[in-house]
Amino acid sequence: MTEIRRLRILITNDDGIKAKGISLLISLLREADFADLYIVAPLEEQSGRSMAFSLVEPTTLEPFDYPQRVQEAWAVTGTPVDCVKLAIGELFKENALDLILSGINNGKNSGRCLYYSATVGAIREANLHGIPAIALSQSENIAFFQEAHMASLIRSLCEFTVAYKHTDPLGLNVNFPASTDDSPWKGIRFTLSGNEFLFGIPRLVRTEGNRRYYTLYDMRDKVSEEFSEEYLALANNYISAAPLVSKNTPRATLSEEELAFLKDSFEQSVLWKASLNLEEDLA
């Protein structure tokens, strides 16, 4: 019998190496037990940094004593893109990575918010280096994350993303819905990224002489008159999975035929493997 090779997976995020979301992801990956895990993540929160990286000031890299068992863990005084660059170009340049995961983010990264997201920025960087990658984000708050069945789903997402063959490596943007009434998630939907986005309302915090201090953290949803597939999936308690190589994304490299093939492949592979209660229509 041929032994199945374990994947080499890098995990990063933008909430910081001590965040709850990355710990949840490590737990699920360890439960699924199909990969060797390597963490390279920011020491501090880097939300909203998109694909920013340390161009002028040097960044530091040091071993981190992670509380869960992984192959290696490193903390970076920089952005998620810094983490990916250091992982690929320095730490693992002699032993290639199979996949990069970013998350689980505390808050959704759907619609056009993916332009701002440092969670998504990390997987874009991975794709630029020819490595498939998945961004994972929990709507509203990480406390809404439902762990039941997620180890098998995460594994099937990882294996599908690595196995998918195209001119460009696959990048998936996965968002988990916030079920405020604690009802179980209905399943997972392959969607396209929507046009919805969050925008910050400038709020004056204080003034010191002529200097004013503002925050843009007061975020509001802006939606189109016609809701996107992604928006409807999340609103109806489905997990959404949107490719980052389709329309409404910075790298629209898939033709309509290729996109249809990707969707069919996803539904035959990931949806079939995941132990979830799938329904036919969005309610």
Curated annotation (Swiss-Prot):
Gene3D superfamilies: Survival protein SurE-like phosphatase/nucleotidase (3.40.1210.10). Disulfide bonds: none annotated. One of its GO terms (molecular function) is 3'-nucleotidase activity. GO terms for cellular component: cytoplasm. The keyword Cytoplasm applies. PANTHER family: 5'-NUCLEOTIDASE SURE (PTHR30457), 5'_3'-NUCLEOTIDASE SURE (PTHR30457:SF12). Belongs to the SurE nucleotidase family. This is 5'-nucleotidase SurE. It comes from Chlamydia trachomatis serovar A (strain ATCC VR-571B / DSM 19440 / HAR-13).
